[in-house]
């Protein structure tokens, strides 16, 4: 374990549907891969890329969310999730939405961290919320988490339906984490800009650690085959440019959508109205329809309150904006 980041230094991140203390139940192995990203920032895309490298092809031994579970998510008993991971003989790769300061940093483990323009992530989260079966999520959560351990009732009623514009205003102005003892506040709706930039910031200050690597949604869009070579190098997996080009065809959004029941998260849990809609469009710039000129100005003022210029350049444009290797 990296002595610079012992277990006692972790921030506790407990929200309505996730608890990073669940990681304490898992014994990490030499060669494990942990993939961390804010919601709707390319985590599933990255899982697919890593799966293509680990299995050297498109076939999986089961649904991706079983092979590579979101360990923190409180809709499956942690004993069941750990038993599945302990039984795996291949190189393990595990999903989390926990910021890096909420994880144990282990020198034997590779940490693959992913970013996306926060505005695009928020739009994608807005559509994902509409695709989610909240009643099913509530049933699963309450079956796993004892009443006295629940942070708050999941999916509490907002009192009135909010427009996308209202959602985005709340997202932009939401509180800065972490409050004492808890990493994220009890959020409603699509979360907050502050949470996204906080999570990316926990990676940014650790990006020069030898086992931490940053990837970006925009870079995937620009050159998917080229980006597939980057995790191959980070993870020590041999792959030629030609092989990466062959494998990348299975990680396009169209290809993943065509196998949504296998690739989308939680498909075996029945939480989506449509598995295919999880891979909605995957584009950039849809946020512009929700932002007035005044909100554009407020957004730029807000992000400069929350993060330094180099991180903001990378967060919005990937390596074209700023190379995190610098």
Swiss-Prot record:
Keywords: Transferase
Gene3D superfamilies per record: P-loop containing nucleotide triphosphate hydrolases (3.40.50.300)
Active site: 97 (proton acceptor)
Residues where 3'-phosphoadenylyl sulfate binds: 40-45, 116-124
EC number, UniProt record: 2.8.2.-
Disulphide-bonded residues: none
SUPFAM superfamilies: P-loop containing nucleoside triphosphate hydrolases
InterPro entries associated with the record: P-loop_NTPase (IPR027417), Sulfotransferase_dom (IPR000863)
GO molecular-function term, one example from the UniProt record: sulfotransferase activity
Superkingdom as given in the UniProt entry: Bacteria
Signal peptide region: none
One protein family per Pfam: Sulfotransfer_1
Listed PANTHER family: SULFOTRANSFERASE SULT (PTHR11783)
Family the UniProt entry places it in: Belongs to the sulfotransferase 1 family.
Job of this protein: Involved in the synthesis of cell wall sulfolipids with activity towards mycobacterial trehalose glycolipids and eukaryotic glycolipids such as glucosylceramide and galactosylceramide (type I and II) but not towards eukaryotic 3'-sulfate galactosylceramide.
Protein's name in the database: Glycolipid sulfotransferase MT1418
Species this protein is from: Mycobacterium tuberculosis (strain CDC 1551 / Oshkosh)
